[in-house]
């Protein structure tokens, strides 16, 4: 009788983490997809997050050292223009593509795929989703600003409208 050989492969169960919002829950690992109980961000597969995070207090210095950085404000047009209450201002030289329009505009942004891009919003709820969308679509150097404009200290890169 021929001997039967069995091979068992142990498949690692997929783990999930929340889209980085800049808070401690970013470090928590979950067993299934869903929403983060702390920040309500979507839970995505560990390893699928390919963007970095920068703290608001580091931003003006970073922009000064990297003047060709694309600053992408994903808030509404009203927020970007300072017509929303409260008005948190924006970053000088920022471009505005509201998150709801971002996916439809990926084609027109293709020329920026290899540029340094910092994505921000008001409270770091929309910008992590936008950063994830960009990084999943071939944008190589995407950074999310933690906390958003609501916690941005005054500085030479901030513009009140």
Regions found by a protein language model. Name each.
Residues 119-121:
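Short, surface-exposed ligand- or partner-binding patches at beta-edge/loop junctions that are enriched
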Residues 8-19, 30-65, 78-116, 125-161:
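Rhodanese-like catalytic fold shared by cysteine-dependent sulfurtransferases
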Residues 23, 123:
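Local cysteine-cluster metal-coordination motifs and their immediate loop/turn environment
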Residues 59, 70-75:
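Short hydrophobic beta-strand that contains or immediately precedes a catalytic carboxylate
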Residues 1-3:
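N-terminal export leaders
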Residues 25-27:
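Extracellular adhesion/carbohydrate-binding repeat motifs centered on closely spaced tryptophans
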